[in-house]
Design a protein with these regions (language model features):
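Active-site bordering "gate/hinge" segments
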Residues: 1-218, 226, 251, 317-346
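Residue-level preference for alpha-helix termini and adjacent loops
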Residues: 16, 21-23, 256-259, 309-310
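Short, surface-exposed beta-edge/turn micro-motifs
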Residues: 147, 199, 220, 257, ...
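Short hydrophobic-aromatic micro-motifs
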Residues: 162, 203-204, 223-225, 230-233, ...
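Surface loops and adjacent helix of pleckstrin homology
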Residues: 165, 235-236, 290, 328
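Dual-mode signal for accessory low-complexity, basic/Gly-rich regions
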Residues: 216, 232-289, 295-296
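Short loop/turn microsegments at loop-to-beta-strand junctions
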Residues: 218-220, 311-312
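Internal helix-turn-beta structural module
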Residues: 274-345
Length: 346
């Protein structure tokens, strides 16, 4: 892959990210954090896009830490705390860390795009009908928010039941219209049912990260949950790695289910090993374990870290109504949105 590969498409997608998603304005300080695993073609394109609209792009690049969701070194933490806009491309993101919370508290508009390369930028932003994607997200937000009983199952053995009891749903994939608010790559809505009502089994079958040793799953990882906490982890080698990683923190909050997330970015049709992309596989559901951010509007707690796992082809029932079946949306309005987005098979 040459430096010129998709160069025009990359620059167009970078401008779309800066101008239409992060809503960068002239004079704003745009801090871009990257590590040595970051695709610098993406970083350069985003810096050029920000500068072309007369913002002040500032790049901070550092060696990979090998640890996600943990506090970076002081110069990085200090810089992001005064950003108007913070775009994180570092493979090992620092979301949920103290500096993240400080930056959000100071009004930064933040997005986490860890692991994004030129193909991911073009496929998930540049070639997507972003206005339609945002509208679909708003519809799903309302649909889930109006439901109480949530049942998630699949052919691998996932069978999870919970109740929303009026909990709010966060559309994390919308433009950055609010100060002090994190937005994520388009194609995701997130929430947490009342934690104590979450009971059953989750079987991750596509991706799980961190720990770094996993990423793409070669075998299912089975979790048994009671009252919103992971009690047992079963499977093969990757399940054992995951079990040891969770235990290594010595933190009981690392076993708490933090969120449900529906994935629906039409540029992602299968797992790649980049979790920001994988948790948006079209039709998937992703579950977070560990820290739960305040913006999720759940119970809110801190933990030593956070991890995300993907169930690729769920069947989801909202108060008995089938939202999707085996990863394919069945609800009438959802099907119409899938057609507008140009998703194959609808």
């Amino acid at each position: 892959m040459t430096e010129e590969y998709l160069s025009c498409e990359v620059q167009l997608a970078a401008m779309k990210l800066v101008k239409d998603v992060m809503l960068v304005k002239p004079g704003e300080n745009v801090v871009i954090t990257a590590d040595t695993a970051t695709d610098m073609r993406v970083v350069e394109a985003v810096m050029k896009a920000a500068y072309s609209i007369r913002a002040n792009p500032i790049l901070i690049k550092y060696p990979i830490t090998g640890k996600a969701f943990e506090e970076p070194v002081y110069p990085v933490a200090n810089a992001v705390s005064s950003a108007d806009v913070w775009i994180e491309f570092a493979y090992y993101c620092v979301m949920h860390s103290p500096c993240f919370q400080k930056a959000i508290g100071n009004g930064a508009r933040y997005t986490c795009l860890c692991g994004m390369d030129v193909i991911m930028l073009v496929n998930t932003i540049g070639r997507v009908k972003y206005d339609v994607l945002v509208s679909f997200g708003e519809y799903l937000t309302e649909k889930v928010q109006n439901a109480d009983e949530i049942i998630v199952c699949d052919n691998n053995g996932t069978n999870l039941k919970a109740f929303n009891r009026g909990r709010r749903v966060k559309h994390s994939g919308q433009p950055a219209i609010k100060k002090g608010y994190p937005v994520m790559l388009g194609g995701q809505v997130s929430w947490c049912p009342v934690e104590e009502t979450i009971e059953g089994t989750i079987v991750f079958d596509a991706a799980l990260f961190p720990p770094d040793e996993i990423g793409l799953l070669r075998e299912p990882v089975r979790l048994e949950l009671k009252e919103g906490c992971v009690l047992e982890i079963k499977g093969g080698t990757q399940a054992e790695i995951f079990k040891r990683w969770l235990a290594s923190f010595g933190d009981s909050n690392m076993y708490r289910l933090a969120h449900y997330s529906l994935g629906f970015n039409p540029g992602v049709l299968s797992a790649t090993g980049r979790i920001v992309e994988d948790e948006r596989i079209f039709g998937c559901i992703e579950f977070g374990i560990g820290s739960q951010g305040a913006s999720l509007m759940g119970a809110f707690w801190n933990a030593a870290s956070h991890t995300d796992g993907v169930v690729s082809k769920p069947t989801i029932l909202l108060d008995g109504e089938v939202l999707e079946e085996n990863g394919i949306y069945k609800e009438k309005t959802c099907v119409e949105y899938c057609k507008k987005l140009g998703v194959a098979g609808y």
